Structures are given as C-alpha cells and as structure tokens.
Amino acid sequence: MNIVPQDTFKSQVSTDQDKSVLSSAVPSLPDTLRQQEGGAVPLSTQLNDRHPLESTLKNWETTQRQRQMEQYRQIFGIAEPMKRTMEMEIVNRTDFNPLSTNGSIHRDILLNKECSIDWEDVYPGTGLQASTMVGDDVHSKIEKQLGI
C-alpha cells in the first residue's frame, strides 16, 4: 500500500522507449504532435526541463484512490471497492460533455471533492495538461470517447 506515488523521474532518455503514440503513416516513428510535447522537442529538454516531483504530482490522486480502495477492502470486504469502482465507471461513461470546461459534479461527489475548490476549478485548462494543446479540442474528445 503506497501513500506516496512511485518515483518515475527520468534520469536518462532513449529514443526507442515510450512508443505509446505512434504515427499512423509510419508506425516505427513517434507522432510528435499527438504526444503534446510542443512539437519537435529535443531529447535534452525531456530530461532537463522536468522536476523530480512532477511525476509524483501527476500520480498523486491515482495513488490516493488506490490506497483508499485498499483500505475499504480491508475494512468492508471486496463489495465496497467494487461498488465504488462500478459507480465511477458509470459516471465516466455517461457524463460526457465535450463542451464543458469544468469537471463533472457526479465525479466530484464520488471522489468526495464536491466541497473543495482546486486551481483547475477556477482556471480551467491551466493545470499540468493545458487544454490549448494540439489534440485537445471538441472533435478529439468526441473521437476519444467514441473510440474512433
């Protein structure tokens, strides 16, 4: 059971790793525009422009959610985390509004965040992933939701 996310800070960069976003024209080449790294970025900036805490902050909520589900499982049995996971999946599948700039109130209630105000609630799209980058428009959201 982790309280703090695993450290995924890169100390070295290789050109053959992280092929998660490949070009549709040439599968062996990475698609630099869809990686949302700002286009053609030198490898040195991938290493030097990242702070060691950035990866921890990106994975913070996921790790806390996993820890919470593990504690629910230990206290209430397997039914409680299964129920909460299914409720979250239902909300993620049904609450789809690509024109909405803020999050879903249903998701906030399930995550127990309905009374908290985060930076992203006041200034949407200014978090770790800005909404002004390539591939984050209405059409891309609809394509991603429908699996196109």
UniProtKB/Swiss-Prot annotation:
Compositional bias of kind Polar residues: 8-26
Keyword terms of this UniProt record: Chaperone
A Pfam short name: UMP1
| Processing and modification events after translation | Seems to be degraded by the proteasome upon its formation.
- Out of the domains of life, which is the source? Eukaryota
GO cellular component, alphabetical, reads:
cytoplasm; nucleus
**Annotated function:** Short-lived chaperone present in the precursor form of the 20S proteasome and absent in the mature complex. Required for the correct assembly and enzymatic activation of the proteasome. Also prevents premature processing of the PRE2 propeptide.
PANTHER family xref list? PROTEASOME MATURATION PROTEIN (PTHR12828:SF3), PROTEASOME MATURATION PROTEIN UMP1 (PTHR12828)
Q: State the similarity comment.
A: Belongs to the POMP/UMP1 family.
An additional note in the Swiss-Prot or TrEMBL entry is: Present with 2740 molecules/cell in log phase SD medium.
- Name the record gives this protein: Proteasome maturation factor UMP1
- Name the gene: UMP1
